[in-house]
Amino acid sequence: MIKVEEALTIIEANSAKMPAQQIAVSKALGYVLAEKVISPIHMPPFRQSAMDGYAFIHSIKHQYDIVSTSQAGDHSNLKLNANEAVRIFTGAFVPDDADTVVMQEHVIANKNSILIAAMPAKSANIRPKGEQIA
C-alpha cells in the first residue's frame, strides 16, 4: 500500500493537462474551472445573525441588560459593555463588540433584561462577513 501523497504524485505525473476553453455556463456540465472565481464583493457585507435572539459579549455571566435592537437592514456603531445585550433578528447586523448570539428560545426575557438558560458556545449563531459569497 502507498501513502496518499505518493498516490497523488503518481496521478499528477500521469494526467494530461487540458487546454482552457471558454464555454457558455449552460453547456458547462461535466467541465471544471481553469481558475478560481473570486467575487469582487462580500455577501453578507457584515457579520450577520443566523438566529432571532440576543447578541452579547460571551462570558460566564448569564444575565444581561437589553440596550438596543438590531433588525435586518439596520447598521449601528453601538458599543456593548460586558453586561449588555442587543435584541437581534435573523439576517441583522451583529454589533462589532458582540461575539455570540443566543437563540431567543434559550433565554428568559423581560422588558429590560435577559437571563440565559442555555449558554451557547462563543461565536455561536454569527455568520461571518463573506460567508455566502467572497
Predicted feature descriptions by range:
Residues 1-65, 112, 126-131:
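Short, low-complexity N-terminal leaders and the immediately following helix N-cap/first helix
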Residues 55-134:
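Short, glycine/charged-enriched hinge/interface segments at domain edges or termini
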